[in-house]
Amino acid sequence: MEKKMLTEVFYLHEKGSLADARLCTYILDDSDSIAIEKRPMMLICPGGGYEHTSDREAEPLAMHFLSIGYHVAVLRYSVAPAVYPTALLEATASMKLIHEHAKEWYVDTDKIVVQGSSAGGHLAACLAMFWHTKWLAEMAGVTNDILKPAAMLLNYPVVTSGEYAHRGSFKQLLGGNETEELLELLSLEKQVTEHTPPAFIWHTYTDQSVPVQNSLLLIGAMKKYEIPVEFHMYPVGKHGLSTCSRLTAMRDGTGIQKECGSWLPLAKRWLIALRDE
C-alpha cells in the first residue's frame, strides 16, 4: 500500500474566532522502511501584525521543517477584528488537537516545538510563557501538560509592549482596549518564569519594524532564570525575511538577504539536538 504525506485542515471555533481560523497539518508517513516510530511536531504561527497571517511565513517554513523530519501544523489564527485572547485560545486548541491525534499521526508529544515570526512570534511565546498557568488551562479546558511546548523558535519576534514595542501589533491584538493590565500581561519579557522552555531566536540589527531590543529583552529575562537560548543577530536585514531567499521574496523583489539565511541550518542543528535529547 502506497503511503503519502497526510494533509488536513481543521477549522477552529473558539470564542471570537473568525470563520477562516484553521490548523493546516502536514503529517509525514510512517513508512515501514524508515526506523522512526514517532516524530517531533512543529506548530507554526505566521506573522502579520495581528492583521493577517503571512503566506511567506507559513507553508515555505513548513516545507523546510518537514525536510528535517518534523511533522508540521500551521496555525492560521484569528486576527483583527478578533482580539485577545482569541488567537491564544486557538493555539491551545491546536495543542489539544495534536495530542488527540498523536497516536494516529505518530507524534512525540514531548517534542512539540512552537514557532513564530514577528507577531506570530508573540503568539508562540504567549503559549510558551503561559502554558503552565491555571487560568490558561481553565480557559482551554485542558490540563497544563497538553499545552506544554518543548521549545520555542522565534523569528524577529514581537515581545515587549514597552519602549520598543511594535505598536501596531498591540493595537490590533487588543482592539483599542490597551489597558495597563493587559499591556503588562502581554509584555512577554515580564512573563518569563522557570517554566519557560528553551528558545532559538534570531533577529536583524537593522530591523526598523520590530526593533531587535524585543529579542534582547526576552533573552535577558530568560538568562535570569538560566533558561537555554541560542540567539543570532545579523548586522543587516529588513523585517519579515522568513527564509531570506527567493523562495519567500516579496513581489517587489525585496526580502532576500542571503547572509541571514544561515538561520535555517543553525536552527536545524538546534532542532536535531533537541529531538535527540
Language-model-detected regions and their locations in the chain:
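Conserved alpha/beta-hydrolase "acid-adjacent" motif
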Residues: 208-217, 242
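Short beta-strand/loop motif that positions the catalytic acidic residue
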Residues: 195, 201-203, 207
